[in-house]
Swiss-Prot record:
Protein's organism: Burkholderia thailandensis (strain ATCC 700388 / DSM 13276 / CCUG 48851 / CIP 106301 / E264)
Residues binding ATP: S14, L15, G16, K17, G18, I19, D71
Family matches, as CDD domains: CTPS_N, GATase1_CTP_Synthase
Protein name: CTP synthase
Domain of life assignment: Bacteria
Length: 553
């Protein structure tokens, strides 16, 4: 029978509930337990797919094609269990499901209310999500409840968790509350009152936390821990200090050293093997002792909010671990390149253009592509980054001066990139779209496998085929591919069913390392193994740096 750990947050948002939940899962997995995680988001949107990156940050895509919260990316990076659509749901999905049932007559004429109908539906979604775990029936399901205790939006979820805990009985569920212990510089001390009030608010709705994770910018002294214990009615050894660190991969060891996994296992009556966190220690050791150092420029329009590129940043960090390289990421606003030119890119060892939407800043990104191609600097284009690389090549090498995407210019006569109107999803069903289709849930999504052209750089990186996740509406137009190939561009991977270009590259005679991918490889990168594409990209940056140094010598 699956046991449940509910993770709640208090005082302020963005304290790191997702990292805390994922770290706990990593420790429990290291003890031989099968673990899955779920994220409950209180907003009314059906999913984050149409939300602005400035509002929500990154949208993480699962293997089965769900657009989900970025915390699911943390979950997959910390444990071996893969996430699915059922691992993340929102208030919007809950209400949509309940209203659909009411319209069908499932409630037999009853008045449909938040309690019991909404709360029952939340519990059903939780149990369904746990049951669908890719690891089989999990020993533990960790359920992260988004938002902050005291928010109106979170109340149905907290009430559902309380009811579920009561229904399952003692030792079948426990609550971990993440809270803030701020340091007041003028007073020169940490303040415990916000934590006391947050726990009090939680207890008012019938939930008494078993463990407190106290976030601060420094370790919390024993005196403050004792005060928190006394006023929160939580045992002193269950008040755990979680201070700021330079790498999130240090968190599992930090929590284990303070006995978090022991407390959870005791409360849930689990008796697993001892924890083995050597992998995490080795990762941190490699991260802190690099042999090389490179600077990679990430050119985008959301660079002021790096949460928009969370998985991409982590993928580069994973590559740094597995290539013994310190990777410095320099965030470059593409609109500044439009205004000021590309002179600011001259010191970079590699250029990366990530995915994105909309016309704003695209000409600056195209300028960055042109610089990387002409200067022979390693280039990686992801999703939109591949499309822009094709547009730049079409304009500046092939001579199609009006080449563009219909996303940016619907009337362009040279539609090098255009809307995909028909494709097969991962189950083999035909999907069709038009310019008038809804924005939400209408993209090509999820993992799809395709063969790789022999003798290419792509084959050297991936092998015979590639299986990566997608999130896009636009695709390189096959009508222009013969002209592009005549100019030297190589389409190194295509989908087997629709013949859509998946990867492009320049031959090594034209450029040492220039790759574009229509998919999002960052979603499958983990600290355990890294990712072959990002490892190759970082190695190319090292080679570029060394060649440049040799030329100067």
């Amino acid at each position: 029978m699956t046991k449940y750990v509910f993770v709640t947050g208090g005082v302020v948002s963005s304290l790191g509930k997702g990292i805390a939940a994922a770290s706990l899962a990593a420790i429990l997995e290291s003890r031989g337990l099968k673990v899955t995680l779920l994220k409950l988001d209180p907003y009314i949107n059906v999913d984050p797919g149409t939300m602005s990156p400035f509002q929500h940050g990154e949208v993480f895509v699962t293997e089965d094609g769900a657009e989900t919260d970025l915390d699911l990316g943390h979950y997959e990076r910390f444990i071996s269990t893969k996430m699915r659509k059922a691992n993340n749901f929102t208030t919007g999905q809950i209400y949509e499901s309940v209203i659909r049932k009411e319209r069908r007559g499932d409630y037999l004429g009853k008045t449909v209310q938040v309690i019991p109908h909404i709360t029952n539906e939340i519990q059903a979604f939780i149990e369904r999500g746990a049951a669908s775990a890719t690891c089989g029936e999990p020993d533990v399901a960790i359920v992260e409840i988004g938002g902050t205790v005291g928010d109106i939006e979170s109340l149905p979820f907290l009430e559902a968790a309380r009811q579920m805990s009561l229904r399952l009985g003692r030792n079948s569920a426990c609550f971990v509350h993440l809270t803030l212990v701020p340091f007041i510089a003028t007073a020169g001390e940490l303040k415990t009152k916000p934590t006391q009030h947050s726990v009090q608010k939680l207890r008012e709705i019938g939930i008494s936390p078993h463990v407190l994770l106290c976030r601060a910018d420094r370790p919390i002294p024993d005196d403050e821990s004792k005060k928190i214990s006394l006023f929160s009615n939580v045992p002193e050894d269950a008040v755990i200090s979680v201070w700021d660190v330079d790498s999130i991969y240090k968190i599992p060891q930090m929590l284990h050293d303070q006995g978090l996994d022991r407390l959870i296992c005791e409360e849930l009556r689990l008796d697993p093997q001892p924890a083995d966190l050597r992998m995490w220690s080795e990762l941190v050791e490699k991260l802190q002792n690099p042999k090389h150092e490179v600077t990679i420029g990430m050119v985008g329009k959301y660079v002021d909010l790096t949460e928009s590129y969370k998985s991409l940043i982590e993928a580069l960090r994973h590559a740094s671990i597995h290539t013994s390289t310190k990777v410095n990421i320099e965030y470059i606003d593409s609109e500044e390149l439009e205004a000021n030119g590309t002179a600011s890119l001259a010191h970079l060892d590699a250029v990366l253009v990530p995915g994105g939407f909309g016309r704003r800043g695209t000409e600056g990104k195209i300028a960055a592509v042109r610089y990387a191609r002409e200067a022979k600097v390693p280039y990686l284009g992801i999703c939109l980054g591949m499309q822009l690389a094709v547009i730049e090549f079409a304009r500046d090498v092939v001579g199609l001066k009006q080449a563009n995407s219909t996303e940016f210019d619907p009337n362009t006569p040279e539609r090098v990139v255009a809307l995909i109107t028909e494709w097969y999803d991962r189950e083999g069903k035909v999907e069709k779209r038009t310019e008038d289709s809804d924005l939400g849930g209408t993209m090509r999504l999820g993992s799809q496998r395709c063969p790789i052209k022999p003798g290419t750089l792509a084959e050297a990186i991936y092998g015979k085929d590639v299986n990566e996740r997608h999130r896009h509406r636009y695709e390189v137009n096959n009508r222009f591919v013969p002209q592009l190939e005549a100019g030297g561009l190589v389409i190194s991977a295509r989908t087997p069913s629709e013949d859509l270009p998946e990867m492009m590259e320049l031959p090594r005679a034209m450029h040492p390392w220039f790759v574009g991918v229509q998919f999002h490889p960052e979603f499958t990168s983990t600290p355990r193994d890294g990712h072959p594409l990002f490892k190759s990209f970082v190695q190319a940056a090292i080679a570029c740096q060394q060649a440049r140094a040799g030329a100067k010598a």
